[in-house]
Each structure stands twice: as C-alpha cells, then as structure tokens.
Amino acid sequence: MSKLSRHAAIRDAITSHPVQNQDELRRLLFKRGHRVTQATLSRDIHELGLVKTGEGYQFPSSEDDSNAAWLPSVERLIREFVYDVKIAQNTVVVKTSAGSAQPVAAALDAEGWPEVVGTVGGDDTIFVVTPSNKDAEKLQSRIKELIA
C-alpha cells in the first residue's frame, strides 16, 4: 500500500471515529488493509499535521469544513513523487513513482498555476497541457527546481 493510500485511510479513520491513541489508529488501519509500525504511524501523524485533543486525534482546522487542512502542497507532492519531467511542444510529461500520478495531477490542477491548462494522470505518468511552448519550458523549469 502506498503512502498516499495510507494517508487517505488515516484521514478517513480520524474523520469517521474518535481515535484516542496510536494503537487504536493502528488497529483501524489494519482493518482497512494497512499494516503499519508505530514508527511509520508516528511519521504519518506528523506529516498529516494531526493534533491530539481531549477528543482524540484531529486535523488542526477541524472546525473548517474544507479538506484543505490535510492536503499536502503541490510542491511537497512534486518533491516526494516526481523524478523526471520532459517537454513535447506545449505538453509537459511528468514521470512519478508508481501510483502517484493521479494525486500529483490533481494537485497541479487545483494549484491554479498559469502554466497549467489541464492534466491527465495515469499510474506513473502525467500529461500537462500548457498554453504555449514557452509556458511548457517555464513549467518544466519550475518542476525541475523542486526535484533538484
């Protein structure tokens, strides 16, 4: 199971049950098909920005109805999952680790970068359409800076 799917399972567990401690969260994840160590779970909790309150683990802005509190930044997703980027005229081809293309593509779409008209994400490849060849070069440079 990928880190992204594990993080999604943690988010689902936290939002659907009051979770008081890491062992309880580990058991909920196990029921969802994720076997995790305490060290991995602790890292995930930190990466997701969960806070422990009297009511259990929560996202910092749980009073906010938006899911933005748990979404990683596009920069972080690019740094973590993208390993190559090439240009084909006004299309940028982004290579990611297996299973990571769709979340990265969704983040690129949501970010509102002017160089991005739209994306198509497969399993490990994203096609990013840009308005022009010059915009494709700008986007390639932007992504290369993040993965360097």
UniProtKB/Swiss-Prot annotation:
Chief location bin: cytoplasm
Top-level lineage group: Bacteria
A GO MF label: DNA-binding transcription factor activity
Pathway: Amino-acid biosynthesis; L-arginine biosynthesis [regulation]
GO biological-process terms attached to the record: L-arginine biosynthetic process; protein complex oligomerization; regulation of arginine biosynthetic process
Cysteine disulfide partners in this protein: none
Cell location: Cytoplasm
Entry-linked SUPFAM superfamilies: C-terminal domain of arginine repressor (SSF55252), Winged helix' DNA-binding domain (SSF46785)
Annotated family: Belongs to the ArgR family.
Entry function: Regulates arginine biosynthesis genes.
Official protein name in the record: Arginine repressor
Organism of origin: Koribacter versatilis (strain Ellin345)
Gene name of the encoded protein: argR
